[in-house]
């Protein structure tokens, strides 16, 4: 964001915008809204999580492939910590990922804490 706001106010607005972007991306992923998820990433963005270190667009592609293989997951997010770095930002957060499946005829949910 740019404008004539005092720097502290601008920083708070930028942190809020990044936090909302992270939430929109996660909800889009959990609901399978792939185009909306893709819109959350710049082409040169980087995603570093437990199973991938790639660009944002590659992360979306691989997430969609997982969903197409019926690997479903839902995310419960912790607080989002945003660090502003000139024209970029770093968002960090913990999450719990719930993965439902059937094991020997019994429905189970495995929860991964990150």
What kind of feature is each model-predicted range?
Residues 1-31, 39, 43:
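Short, low-complexity N-terminal intrinsically disordered segments enriched in polar/charged residues
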Residues 108-111:
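Outer-membrane beta-barrel transmembrane domain signature
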């Amino acid at each position: 964001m740019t404008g004539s706001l005092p720097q502290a106010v601008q920083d708070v607005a930028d942190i809020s915008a990044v936090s909302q972007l992270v939430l929109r991306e996660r909800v889009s992923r959990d609901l399978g809204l792939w185009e909306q998820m893709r819109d959350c990433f710049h082409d040169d963005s980087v995603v570093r999580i437990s199973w991938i270190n790639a660009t944002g667009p590659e992360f979306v592609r691989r997430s969609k492939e997982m969903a197409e293989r019926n690997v479903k997951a839902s995310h419960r997010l912790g607080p989002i910590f945003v660090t502003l770095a000139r024209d970029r930002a770093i968002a960090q957060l913990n999450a719990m990922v719930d993965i439902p499946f059937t094991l020997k005829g019994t429905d189970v949910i495995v929860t991964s804490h990150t």
